[in-house]
Amino acid sequence: MSKVSFKITLTSDPRLPYKVLSVPESTPFTAVLKFAAEEFKVPAATSAIITNDGIGINPAQTAGNVFLKHGSELRLIPRDRVGSC
């Protein structure tokens, strides 16, 4: 089984820290979101992953699908930043 890698940046931190995660293509993207949130010590239940263009990603798909549709560079945003003006 092949793997895909994502560079996930935490946008709520002014230093823009990032983590590179490699997971099997068939991994549910919800698991990637949960793991990334835990790595950054933010609550997974209130976080979202978006593309660098600001497009939200539906986590109900495989990591392989997300990689093919959106590429490897993604951003993690805690919900206190989602939809706020």
From Swiss-Prot:
Modification note: UFM1 precursor is cleaved by UFSP1, promoting its maturation: processing of the C-terminal Ser-Cys dipeptide is required to expose its C-terminal conserved Gly residue.
Any Gene Ontology biological process: regulation of intracellular estrogen receptor signaling pathway
CC per GO annotation: cytoplasm; endoplasmic reticulum; nucleus
Covalent cross-link Glycyl lysine isopeptide (Lys-Gly) (interchain with G-Cter in UFM1), where: 69
Paired cysteines (S-S): none
Alphabetic keyword roster: Cytoplasm, Isopeptide bond, Nucleus, Ubl conjugation, Ubl conjugation pathway
Top-rank lineage group of the source organism: Eukaryota
Propeptide residue interval(s): 84-85
Positions of crosslink type Glycyl lysine isopeptide (Gly-Lys) (interchain with K-? in acceptor proteins): 83
Record localization: Nucleus; Cytoplasm
Coiled-coil residue windows: none
Free-text function comment from the UniProt entry: Ubiquitin-like modifier which can be covalently attached via an isopeptide bond to lysine residues of substrate proteins as a monomer or a lysine-linked polymer. The so-called ufmylation, requires the UFM1-activating E1 enzyme UBA5, the UFM1-conjugating E2 enzyme UFC1, and the UFM1-ligase E3 enzyme UFL1. Ufmylation is involved in various processes, such as ribosome recycling, response to DNA damage, transcription or reticulophagy (also called ER-phagy) induced in response to endoplasmic reticulum stress.
Binding partners and assembly: Interacts with UBA5. Interacts with UFC1.
Protein family according to the UniProt entry: Belongs to the UFM1 family.
The protein's name in its UniProt record: Ubiquitin-fold modifier 1
Taxonomic source organism: Rattus norvegicus (Rat)
Gene that this sequence comes from: Ufm1
